[in-house]
Amino acid sequence: MSPGVKVALVPGVLALLPAYAGRIDPVAELRAACVEAVRWLGNDFAVVADPQGMRVVEALRRSLGLDGRSAVTGLSARPTAVLVVGNGSARRSEKAPGHLDERAVAYDSELEKALRGGDVEALRGLDRGLAAELMVGHVDGFARLAELLIPGAAAEVDYADDPFGVQYWVMRWSLPA
C-alpha cells in the first residue's frame, strides 16, 4: 500500500519571519503551530504560495534546520506532501491592516467551514473580487487546495484565530494515496 498525501495550510503572515519575533514573539502560538505543520510534512514538500508566502515558508524551513530554498514549488507531479500558504480576511476589526469591513467575519466563517469539511466546491467557488476587497491572503492558494483535497476530507485544526484583525489558520489533512 502506497503512502497517502499530506497537505498543510499555514498563513503567509510576515510576523512569522524571525525579524518580527523580537524579545517577545507576538505570534508565538501561531509560529509553534506552523513549525509543527511543516515538521509533519517532512523534508520534501511542494509549496503553493505567493512571494510573501514563500518568504514565510523559507523561514519556517530554516527554523527546522532545513534548507530554506529546497522546497519544491508547483504541483507538476502528484506530490506526497504539499504546503499551501494563505489566510483569511485582513479586515476583521478596526485595528486590522485593512480596517473593519462588516463582511469579513461572515466570509471567513464560510471559508473556515469549507476548509474544515473539505468542501472543494466552495473552495473552488470563492468570490475572488470579494476576497480582494477583504484582503484575503493568497486566495489562489485556496483554489489549489481544492484540487488537492478529497471532497469531505476533514481537517485537523491546529490553529484558528484572528490576532491583529486578520484570520489565520493552521490545518492539516491526511489523504489516501
Language model regions located:
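Conserved active-site and cofactor/substrate-binding residues in soluble primary-metabolism enzymes
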Residues: D25-A32, R55, A106, V136-D140, ...
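A short aromatic-anchored loop/beta-hairpin motif
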Residues: M1-E58, L64-G68
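Short Gly/Thr/Asp-enriched flexible loops that form oxyanion-binding sites at enzyme active sites
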Residues: Q52-R61, R92-L100
